[in-house]
């Protein structure tokens, strides 16, 4: 599988976006937002935004490949997420499960975060199978993260691209891969967000 290559390419494209002058970056992000709800390649104005320097092995023949879908969704959703937020909404290490946990805790106002309504949305996303259905649920989740109380909650977009690529896996040799992605989401959601005690504290 090309998981790490997809993640690396998404990282490169995000760095390219972030390095643009302000006016040019805003224009590029606005263009990417217009791609929401469309399939990769459907809008010619976006070809360069996600196909620039894309490895030939990523490219589909008769339809968008899993890699093209993954990169396209990561970039267009990042553009939605960044809108209205001054600080970068791409944050390495803040996976989807962790970001949803942060959102649930903020929305629970001191109550049990596991009862937060956002978790029902997350469950709908996690059980979606078709990439278009995944895209629909993910868009709603990104909008919630963007509009979170006390400022938007960022997300690791290269990792999201990798997850989206693996969710589309149909190779029987890697039949467990989509389930493993969902398991990681659940693990990150329920993992204790507090830093572990260091060895000295444990000894005391």
Describe the predicted segments one by one.
Residues 56-106:
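Aromatic- and glycine-enriched beta-alpha-beta binding-site module
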Residues 12-13, 28-31, 121, 140:
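A general alpha-helix detector
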Residues 17, 21, 36-39, 82, ...:
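Short, flexible helical or helix-coil boundary motifs
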Residues 15-78:
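N-terminal interaction modules that seed assembly of large macromolecular complexes
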Residues 89, 94-167:
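Conserved binding-pocket/active-site segment within a compact domain
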Residues 150-204:
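Alpha-helical oligomerization segments
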Residues 1-23:
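Short, extreme N-terminal leader segments that mark the start of a protein/domain
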């Amino acid at each position: 599988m090309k998981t790490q290559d997809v993640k690396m390419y998404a990282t490169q494209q995000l760095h390219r976006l972030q390095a643009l002058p302000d006016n040019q970056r805003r224009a590029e992000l606005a263009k990417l937002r217009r791609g929401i709800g469309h399939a990769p390649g459907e809008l010619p104005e976006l070809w360069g935004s996600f196909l620039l320097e894309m490895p030939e092995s990523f490219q589909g023949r008769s339809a968008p490949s899993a890699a093209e879908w993954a990169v396209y969704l990561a970039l267009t959703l990042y553009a939605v997420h960044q809108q209205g937020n001054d600080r970068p909404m791409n944050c390495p290490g803040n996976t989807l499960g962790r970001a949803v946990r942060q959102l649930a805790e903020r929305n629970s106002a001191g109550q049990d975060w596991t009862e937060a309504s956002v978790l029902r949305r997350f469950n709908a996303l996690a059980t979606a199978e078709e990439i278009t259905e995944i895209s629909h649920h993910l868009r709603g989740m990104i909008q919630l993260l963007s509009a979170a109380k006390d400022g938007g909650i960022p997300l690791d977009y290269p990792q999201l691209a990798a997850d989206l690529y693996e969710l589309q896996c149909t190779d029987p040799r890697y039949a467990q891969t989509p389930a493993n992605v969902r398991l990681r989401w659940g693990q990150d959601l329920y993992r204790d967000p507090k830093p572990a005690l260091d060895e000295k504290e444990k000894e005391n």
